[in-house]
């Protein structure tokens, strides 16, 4: 059975791919759906305001509040 962490990694990679291929079409899968956006406001957004955003204002953001 696939672990939850593996699913999150796959979703994140998919979001990054979508953000690269159709960045401004769907807002990088972030502002369009806001679920797991690569550059949007998704829960696990890479650069967005997600809860676990790397550079965003998420609860555990790297440089955010």
Swiss-Prot record:
Give the UniProt keywords, A-Z: Amidation, Cleavage on pair of basic residues, Neuropeptide, Repeat, Secreted, Signal
The GO cellular component terms are:
extracellular region
The PTM Tyrosine amide maps to 29, 39, 47, 55
S-S bridge residues: none
The processes (GO biological process) annotated in the record are: IRE1-mediated unfolded protein response; neuropeptide signaling pathway
Residue numbers of Tryptophan amide PTMs: 63
**Which range is the signal sequence, renumbered to this chain?**
1-22
Indicate where this protein resides in the cell. Secreted
Q: What does this protein do?
A: May have antimicrobial activity.
The record's similarity note reads: Belongs to the YARP (YGGW-amide related peptide) family.
Full protein name: Neuropeptide-like protein 28
């Amino acid at each position: 059975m696939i672990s939850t962490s593996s699913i999150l990694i796959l979703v994140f990679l998919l979001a990054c791919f979508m953000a690269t291929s159709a960045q401004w079409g769907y807002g990088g899968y972030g502002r369009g759906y806001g679920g797991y956006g690569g550059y949007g406001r998704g829960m696990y957004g890479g650069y967005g305001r997600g809860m676990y955003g790397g550079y965003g204002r998420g609860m555990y953001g790297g440089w955010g509040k």
